[in-house]
């Protein structure tokens, strides 16, 4: 490229010089023309020399490029050759390794073939020996049968019987040892669990009484409570079934009755009447009805509170109401509501120690005495009644079984049922929890009411005066005055036949006729 430029440059310079010479020749004198020609000649010479220099430099640069390209090519060729040699060596090594492995495999194959032949030969030898031994055993067995007079089957049976007897004896000894060890361990563990449960829960309890005291603002209120010819006190006793004892006790009226629900109703009603000041039979019936509603509300709240305290949920509202009614029930003077809570807590503690469902254990403990909330009109033990109620209101079969089995009405077949039994015994049998005399007294009063209500035409009955009198309220439409006399005798005879009691019991049959009309 530089050579071409040099040639072009020379041509242009020559042309320029020629033109300049012509111009100078025409315009200048001959001297000037000659000088111009000399100048042009020098310019041409300079251009030639420069062109030669450029040409030489270009040739040298071309040689350098060719040399560098050749050197690069030779270097790359050497590197590729080296890589090929390395790859060739690697392939050669792999080939040698494969040859060695093939030789090793061939040797192993030969060894295996040799061993297989040896095993076959040994197997044939063993088969021959086995046949020989079988023949020898058969020969010896025949000789033994001939000498002993027993067949091989008989001898085998005798041997098996002896071994079986020995095995049974060993197994029986082992089982007995295991049972004793398990019994000792279980007894120790159960004592630990029960003692821990008793230590962790210590419920407070005050023995129930059969009387309530209502404070009066003054002794003058006693006369108003009695009313003209005693009509107010009779109306209150008839409406509540509770004895009102008005004696010399200053500014107080004593309510006596074994049924805590009725006694609570009577107490609330009397307090309202005293506060209101209007005391007459019509007002008494109205206030008693309101008091019964308040007690029912208190019953519902007590059931809800029990479930909340224990952390058990999903209990049917009717069951919660029955649990609340247990607050007004006693068993050997022990409040059944508090007893149920105590059993539930004890069940939960023992269940946590045993690693079973704590919520389920608390639920079973809370509901175990549910049947005691039902009045005596329903026949059956409280365990059976409670189980039926639990089943009716959707409790699980495990809970139903635990309720049914806690007094052995059904054999307990689950850990939960046994836990409820244990917790029930812990709560009831601890010192000071119950009093036998109180329960016997209440049972006698309940039997009096049960016997009285078993006759037709009886609306209600109330055992009063500490069980020395039973008031029987009859329907005026079903029982006439003459029939009332006979009914009193029949009730008295049945009480004499079925009950044992000190002194005598007064049977008072009350037949009331009401005529109601409205003035408009």
UniProtKB/Swiss-Prot annotation:
Q: Which InterPro entries match?
A: HD/PDEase_dom, HD_domain, HDIG_dom, KH_dom, KH_dom_type_1, KH_dom_type_1_sf, Ribonuclease_Y, RNase_Y_N
Identify the residues that the record assigns to the KH domain, covering every copy.
Answer: 210-273
Q: What class of enzyme is it?
A: hydrolase
Q: Which GO terms describe its cellular component?
A: plasma membrane
Q: Which domain of life is it from?
A: Bacteria
Q: Which residues form a coiled coil?
A: none
This protein's UniProt keywords: Cell membrane, Endonuclease, Hydrolase, Membrane, Nuclease, RNA-binding, Transmembrane, Transmembrane helix
Tell me where it resides: Cell membrane
The record ties this protein, via PROSITE patterns, to: HD, KH_TYPE_1
UniProt membrane topology term: Single-pass membrane protein
Q: What is its main location?
A: membrane
Q: Which family does it belong to?
A: Belongs to the RNase Y family.
Q: Which HAMAP family match?
A: RNase_Y
| Function recorded in the entry | Endoribonuclease that initiates mRNA decay.
PANTHER family noted in UniProt: RIBONUCLEASE Y
Q: What is this protein called?
A: Ribonuclease Y
The scientific name of the source species is: Geobacter sulfurreducens (strain ATCC 51573 / DSM 12127 / PCA)
Give the gene symbol.
rny
């Amino acid at each position: 490229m530089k050579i071409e430029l040099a040639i072009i440059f020379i041509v242009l310079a020559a042309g320029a010089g020629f033109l300049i010479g012509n111009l100078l020749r025409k315009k200048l004198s001959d001297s000037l023309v000659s000088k111009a020609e000399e100048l042009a000649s020098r310019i041409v010479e300079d251009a030639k020399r420069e062109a030669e220099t450029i040409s030489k430099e270009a040739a040298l640069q071309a040689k350098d490029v060719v040399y560098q390209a050749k050197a690069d090519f030779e270097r790359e060729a050497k590197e590729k050759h080296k890589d090929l040699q390395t790859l060739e060596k690697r392939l050669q090594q792999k080939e040698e390794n494969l040859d060695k492995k093939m030789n090793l495999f061939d040797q192993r194959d030969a060894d295996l073939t040799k061993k297989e032949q040896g095993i076959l030969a040994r197997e044939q030898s063993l088969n021959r020996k086995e046949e020989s031994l079988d023949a020898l055993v058969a020969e010896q067995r025949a000789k033994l049968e001939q000498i002993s007079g027993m067949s091989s089957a008989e001898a085998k049976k005798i041997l098996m019987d002896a071994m079986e007897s020995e095995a049974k004896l060993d197994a029986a000894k082992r089982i007995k040892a295991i049972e004793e060890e398990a019994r000792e361990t279980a007894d120790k563990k159960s004592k630990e669990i029960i003692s821990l449960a008793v230590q962790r829960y210590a419920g407070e309890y005050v023995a129930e009484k059969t009387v309530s005291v209502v404070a009066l603002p003054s002794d003058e209120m006693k006369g108003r409570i009695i009313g003209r010819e005693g009509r107010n006190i009779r109306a209150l006793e008839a409406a509540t079934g509770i004895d009102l004892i008005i004696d010399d006790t200053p500014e107080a009226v004593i309510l006596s009755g074994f049924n805590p629900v009725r006694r609570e109703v009577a107490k609330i009603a009397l307090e309202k009447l005293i506060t209101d000041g209007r005391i007459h039979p019509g007002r008494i019936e109205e206030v008693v009805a309101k008091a019964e509603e308040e007690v029912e509300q208190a019953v519902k709240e007590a059931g809800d509170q029990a479930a909340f305290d224990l952390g058990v949920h999903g209990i049917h509202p009717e069951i919660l109401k029955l649990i609340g009614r247990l607050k007004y029930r006693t068993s050997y003077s022990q409040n059944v509501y508090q007893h149920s809570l105590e059993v539930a807590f004890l069940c939960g503690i023992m269940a946590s120690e045993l690693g079973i469902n704590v919520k389920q254990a608390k639920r079973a403990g809370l509901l175990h005495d549910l049947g005691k909330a039902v009045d005596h009109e329903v026949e059956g033990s409280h365990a059976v009644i409670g189980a039926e109620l639990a089943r009716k209101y959707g409790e699980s079969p495990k809970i139903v079984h635990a309720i049914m089995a806690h007094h052995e009405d059904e054999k307990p077949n689950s850990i939960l049922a046994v836990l409820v039994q244990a917790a029930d015994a812990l709560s009831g049998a601890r010192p000071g929890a119950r009093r036998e005399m109180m329960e016997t007294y209440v049972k006698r009063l309940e039997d009096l009411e049960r016997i009285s209500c078993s006759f037709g035409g009886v609306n209600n009955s109330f055992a009063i005066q500490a069980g020395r009198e039973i008031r029987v309220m009859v329907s005026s439409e079903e029982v006439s005055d003459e029939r009332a006399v006979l009914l009193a005798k029949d009730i008295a005879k049945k009480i004499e036949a079925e009950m044992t009691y000190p002194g005598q019991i007064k049977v008072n049959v009350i037949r009331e006729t009401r005529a109601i009309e409205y003035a408009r």
